[in-house]
Design a protein with these regions (language model features):
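A shared catalytic/ligand-binding motif for oxyanion handling
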Residues: 1-243
Length: 243
């Protein structure tokens, strides 16, 4: 299964929609998570009509701010359990095994970042299923994940680390450029950060030990998209079924 997560920074012009369509054709994700769509429900329905996804749950933007959409192929057994302007929590069934997918968008405002970690901890309390959590967390874990301008204070990074530890989530790493966002400036004014990532608990990592995460650059948006590919061997499927 392929899962693609992208902070598209708005789908209000044809260029953005064309880039998205090309991305879907090229990478063929089974599940697509979009953040900051800046679209109404009706607008997202029109975009969906041009994509190969029969299923969608969307949170409309408010005054052209925010907006989420989770789209999936008809052959994916996915059921969204709860959602908000900052997340979508779904249960996926495959080969008689169950696992949980949380698509996450952290608060970008500095004074509200604590709400991201409160939400993450609340989601942790809802289920003990194998758990994959991906998206734009709007925070870094260490100074190596930022380049340019002044260093990030330690406290916000520590809060993020503590939230992941509390939830039993571990970063799955990546292939490609370490940074997933930049401010589009040049020279000394350029700032780059790793804001987007994929995390999972031990149960999920045991279920999908050959998972691969890639950072993919696109011509539109200041964010890379995150492509996550999950595979299970026949032996691993049998173990999961037996549990």
């Amino acid at each position: 299964m392929k899962i693609l997560s992208w902070n598209c920074r708005g789908l209000g012009n044809q260029t953005a929609v064309d880039v998205l369509s090309h991305l879907v054709r090229e990478k063929a994700p089974n599940v697509l998570f979009l953040m900051e769509t800046k679209q109404s429900m009706a607008e997202m329905r029109r975009i969906q009509a041009d994509l190969p996804y029969h299923c969608m749950v969307a949170v409309p933007s408010v005054c052209r701010r925010g907006g989420l959409a989770l789209l999936w192929m008809v052959d994916v057994d996915l059921h969204v359990q709860i959602y908000s302007p900052n997340h979508m929590d779904a249960l996926i069934t495959k080969d008689n095994s169950f696992w949980r997918l949380t698509s996450f968008y952290g608060w970008p405002e500095e004074q509200r970042k604590h709400k991201s970690w409160q939400l993450l901890k609340h989601l942790h309390s809802r289920s003990s299923y194998p758990w994959l959590c991906c998206g734009d967390f709007n925070e870094i874990l260490c100074m190596e994940e930022k380049q340019g301008q002044i260093p990030r204070p330690l406290r916000p990074m520590q809060d993020f680390k503590e939230a992941l530890l509390f939830c039993g989530l571990a970063d799955l790493g990546f292939h490609g450029n370490i940074f997933t966002w930049d401010n589009g400036r040049l020279g000394e004014d350029l700032v780059q950060k790793r804001l987007d990532r994929v995390c999972a608990n031990m149960e999920w990592r045991d279920m999908f030990p050959h998972d691969k995460v890639s950072h993919l650059q696109v011509s539109y948006s200041d964010h890379f998209n995150i492509n996550n590919r999950t595979t299970q061997s026949k032996k691993e499927k049998e173990v999961v079924k037996a549990l």
